[in-house]
A protein has these predicted regions:
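Alpha-helical support elements that line or immediately flank enzyme active sites
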Residues: 149-161
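N-terminal glycine-/serine-/threonine-rich beta1-alpha1-beta2 phosphate-ribose binding loop
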Residues: 1-98, 222, 370-373, 386-389
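A short hydrophobic/small-residue beta-strand
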Residues: 101-103
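Conserved active-site and cofactor/substrate-binding residues in soluble primary-metabolism enzymes
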Residues: 16, 20, 24, 67, ...
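Rossmann-fold NAD(P)-binding glycine/threonine-rich loop
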Residues: 107-138
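C-terminal active-site/capping subdomain that shapes the small-molecule cofactor and substrate pocket
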Residues: 244-375, 397-402
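Short, ordered loop/turn segments at secondary-structure junctions
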Residues: 43-45, 106-110, 114, 146-147, ...
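Active-site-lining helix/loop region of Rossmann-like oxidoreductase modules
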Residues: 12, 16, 160-294, 324
Length: 402
């Protein structure tokens, strides 16, 4: 829809949660002229009734945090962005049934692993419930992030000039110590003795969304998988490590190398690797490269690194500033996808269903000004911030229930 000047009317957005990721997205959303924040839902009682800007440490934005789904819906958003740690169907279902689209960064890419590993109390699958809510409301549901999410899109696109593919690898190789989410790292076993028999299952439980990453790639490659296999290596701390916000005793889990392997006839054909380091002082340890790596074996072969660098002049004197870069690259794929999701047909969609413009950023207003009508995708808008590793977007550690 266009306004009288020919510019596309901003999409009305309501946000859920202002944890690490949600806080950064409130800051970024105000620089997206095609988006307008109209509501904020918070879980923490001490945030209710406060201005969203005050909550995240910026000037007031004129939107007050509320506590109920009814208030969220009453704001009449076109789309809700959900930045909690884990899916919340108590919010998803009524929002979708009300005809409001929803984009989430919480533990969802294709939904395969939620169906397999997270039974709903109703006895039905989360996918079934979400799909029915979309049908009733004529709404669209989409899950994304940096990894899983954009990292797999980059790998898929790199295969466009390759024939006779034999193997595809997408790897995240990052230091995760800047992501201060004690709850998340407790849940995945960091700090527990590396020989604790619970650790492998904990790591798998909270990273199983990366099976979705493998299945998304398989869908795009039109490759039918027999199964997705989980494998791991664990790094034990060689000394007591004090990160200030997290303690890692000697002999505890301080790093890991996880693999999700898409198997065909007992051969790994599509692989998702995670090299996560909380400290370099582990045995074994890995060559953490601080980037995302694509490797494709075929004709020709492809090797590519996606290296995220901070904006020039960024002040990294505080850990929070450094961590904000990771939050930015985790959340911006969600914000930049909103117009494509709003334009998409009703139902559950994946990145395979959206047009190329769903993965495009926006130019700064200082570059394009405020005039013009833009093209079919709307005006050229602003994107603020670069850099970071994306961190633990897959485990949900970039958000919280706040």
């Amino acid at each position: 829809m266009n306004d009288p000047t020919g510019r596309r009317t901003p999409i009305r957005v309501a946000q859920v949660a202002t944890g690490n990721l949600g806080t950064e997205m409130i800051k970024r959303l105000r620089h997206q002229p095609d988006l307008e924040l109209v509501a904020l839902h918070c879980y923490s009682p001490d945030k209710i009734g406060r201005d969203a800007g005050e909550i995240v440490g910026i000037e007031p934005v004129g939107v007050v945090a509320t506590a109920t789904v009814d208030e969220l819906i009453a704001a009449k958003p076109d789309c809700v962005t959900f930045h909690g740690v884990f899916p919340d169907l108590d919010i998803y279902l009524p929002v979708l049934e009300a005809g409001i689209d929803l984009v989430t960064t919480a533990d969802w890419i294709t939904g395969h692993h939620r169906v397999a590993n997270h039974p709903h109390p109703s006895g039905r699958t989360e996918r079934e419930l979400i799909a029915e809510a979309c049908e009733r409301g004529g709404s669209t549901f989409y899950g994304t992030g940096m990894n899983p999410g954009l990292a797999q899109i980059l790998t898929i696109v790199h295969s466009a000039d390759v024939t006779e593919i034999e193997r595809v690898l997408c790897k995240e190789s990052v230091d995760v110590s800047c992501h201060h989410s004690v709850e998340t790292w407790n849940e995945v076993g960091f700090g527990l003795p590396v020989d604790d028999p619970r650790v492998p299952a904990m790591l798998e439980k909270y990273t199983r969304v990366f099976e979705d990453a493998v299945r998304l790639m398989a869908d795009c490659f039109d490759l039918e998988l027999d199964e997705v296999h989980f494998d791991y290596e664990l790094g034990a701390c060689t000394d007591d490590i004090d990160l200030g916000w997290y303690q890692l005793p000697k002999g505890s889990l301080g790093g890991c190398y996880l693999k999700y392997l898409g198997m065909v006839d007992d051969v790994a054909r599509i692989e998702m690797h995670l090299e996560w380091q909380m400290t370099p002082h582990t045995a074994p340890n890995w060559n953490i490269q601080g980037c995302y790596i694509t490797q494709i074996d075929g004709d020709p072969c492809i090797y590519s690194k996606h290296l995220i660098l901070p904006k020039p002049g960024t002040d990294f004197s505080s850990a929070a500033t450094f961590a904000a870069v990771g939050m930015t690259v985790t959340g911006m794929p969600a914000l930049n996808s909103i117009r494509a999701v709003v334009d998409a047909p009703p139902g559950i969609v994946t990145s395979a269903d959206l047009p190329l413009r769903a993965f495009a950023g926006r130019f700064a207003e200082s570059v394009v000004g405020t005039g013009g009508t833009g093209g079919p995708g709307g005006p050229a808008e602003s994107v603020v911030g670069t850099g970071g590793t994306g961190g633990t977007g897959g485990t949900g550690g970039t958000g919280d229930g706040a």
